[in-house]
C-alpha cells in the first residue's frame, strides 16, 4: 500500500511501498511533491502546477475512470465544485510507480455545492467569480452504487450531520462527461 499525504505547504506527497514481500521492515520511497499538467485552458501554454489541497478536506483517491490507475477528485474551495485530476500513466505505458496527473474536469459532475451544503445540479460556476465563503472541511468518495459503469459521488461537509449523495447519469445518457442528475440530501436513508 502506498501513502498519499500533504506537505506543510499542502502539496501532495506520494510514498511508494518498497517493502520486500514477507519482510516485517516497512520501506517507502519518497517520490517528492507532485504537480499536475494544466492543459485545460487552451489559451495558455502548458504548465505544471503544484497538486495541492486544503488541509481540512479529504480528496477521493481511486480509479475513478476505470483505466487501472489512481485518479484524484478534490473539492475546489474557490469555486464550490469538484476537480478531477486524471493519472495518464496507463495511456502513456508507464509502470505502476510513476504518475502524471492532468486536470481533466474543473467542474466534475456539473454541479455546485453551496456554502450551506446545498447542491445545484446542472450549474458550474467556474467562470463566475464567487466570493470565498467556505473554509474547508469537505470530504468525498465515489462508488458505482447502481452497477452501471459510472461512479456516484457522496460528499460531506463539516457542520452538517448527513452526507449528500449525487447520482451520476453518464452511463444512461452515454455522455463523455460525468454529469450528476439527482441528489439525495438525506443519505443514507436508514440513519
What residue ranges belong to the model's regions?
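Beta-propeller blade termini
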Residues: 1, 55-64, 136-145
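Acidic/hydrophobic-patterned starts of short beta strands in beta-sheet-rich repeat architectures
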Residues: 1-7, 66-76, 147-157
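Calcium-coordinating acidic loop motifs
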Residues: 18-20, 62-69, 88-90, 144-150, ...
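Blade-edge motifs of beta-propeller repeat domains
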Residues: 18-54, 89-135, 169-191
